[in-house]
Amino acid sequence: MANVVVVGAQWGDEGKGKITDLLSEKAHVVVRYQGGVNAGHTLVVGGQTFKLHLIPSGILYPDKRCIIASGTVIDPEVLLAEIDQLHQLGISTDNLFIAETAHVTLPYHRVIDIAEEERRGIYRLGTTGRGIGPTYADKAERMGIRVVDLMYPDQLRERLSWAIPYKNVLLEKIYNLPPLDPEPIIEQYLAYAERLRPYVTDAALLLTQAIEDRENILFEGAQGTLLDLDYGTYPYVTSSHPIAGGACIGAGIGPTSIDRVIGVAKAYTTRVGEGPFPTELKDEIGAYLGATGAEFGTTTGRQRRCGWFDGVIGRYAVRINGLDCLAITKLDVLDGLDEIKVCVAYEYQGREIRHFPSDARVFAQCKPIYETLPGWKCSTKDCRSIQDLPPEAHDYLKFLAQLMQVPIAIVSLGASRDQTIIVEDPIHGPKRALLYPNGGKRAHALMPD
């Protein structure tokens, strides 16, 4: 295999969990490198559905080491509930490792997150209310609690005995909320610590050893490129770095250790929460995509906003992440449509632009410029090769590859593992930079011309 990063190429919810699950078969180590319980992925294996938020998708393979790395923020209550759920389903977590340097979400983070959203009013960001932003804020302010702090009861008690009264000042003076009682929180987190203790390790050192042993490592990002703190639709973003570069910081490895980057995108576009969304459909087609695609968030249950595929943000994701290939998911959701539109550029103040604007105010005024392609009436759910697809579906995928100038290696046609077409080996196929040596072209069913 290689050391591979899987990233979302849109606003999250692209189906990264399924793709990671598929690729995990050839990996020795699977790493979640950022985010927290604000992200979720759903896996369907053998008729069983698994909904996970923190634990890497590779946990379903008992011989894969699964690491929750330093770049994540960990809610012990949710993590332990996931561990218990897996145990109830007969799945071992002996292969799970938690970075001792990851930061911990506490009750005051969740309370502040919800209170701050309410305080923002019409300027709310649409957070999940799970305390992720406040946890990362404490990390940046160097006042956070880390997993390693949980391992030392006296130190944890001392840190929380200072932190909780500090946060109570904010709760009372800024948000007009009652203060939190420190003692129950301290006792609860001491109990969490004992249950988590067997999993805690120096994850960066573990990864370094795996790299030195030439093991195959799969890095699993949460959310998506357009939610990146620096490169997303700021301020409507997450508080970490879902992009490929975030894998290095979040996991504690050097950039030369990454061999390949795979982007995951839906065959259309969705977004949860607030923020600009040029191709959003507020008509019956948008409702059809939402209903057919079961577009409800794994974490919050909120209905996702749906729209046509946006090639502008797609090209941006290719550039920002250095994508080598794409996995296109939920192609089957487009079955039955008479025509399908793809955004190829934006109109802004009477002129055409083909780049993603960094200013959210500009982005909010962008109108999509569409190319219209014919749809297909037959089902694609049972297709298992490119040749099985209706010609219109094949042409649609070819158009996306051409638009984004990156090959499509995987096509997903449903939630199950077997509802997948492997067009080209996503691990050992050509890197995008090598597709056209000496000006030549490489034949590929879904390769840009």
Swiss-Prot record:
Cofactor(s) needed: Mg(2+)
Catalytic reaction(s) noted: IMP + L-aspartate + GTP = N(6)-(1,2-dicarboxyethyl)-AMP + GDP + phosphate + 2 H(+)
Superkingdom assignment: Bacteria
Subcellular location: Cytoplasm
Cofactor binding note: Binds 1 Mg(2+) ion per subunit.
Keyword annotations: Cytoplasm, GTP-binding, Ligase, Magnesium, Metal-binding, Nucleotide-binding, Purine biosynthesis
Cited SMART domains: Adenylsucc_synt (SM00788)
Gene3D superfamilies referenced in this protein's UniProt entry, alphabetically: Adenylosuccinate Synthetase, subunit A, domain 1, Adenylosuccinate Synthetase, subunit A, domain 2, Adenylosuccinate Synthetase, subunit A, domain 3
Binding site for substrate: 298-304
Residues binding IMP: 13-16, 38-41, 128, 142, 223, 238, 302
PANTHER family tied to this protein: ADENYLOSUCCINATE SYNTHETASE
Subunit comment: Homodimer.
Biological role stated in the UniProt entry: Plays an important role in the de novo pathway of purine nucleotide biosynthesis. Catalyzes the first committed step in the biosynthesis of AMP from IMP.
Entry protein name: Adenylosuccinate synthetase
Organism: Synechococcus sp. (strain JA-2-3B'a(2-13))
Lineage: Bacteria, Bacillati, Cyanobacteriota, Cyanophyceae, Synechococcales
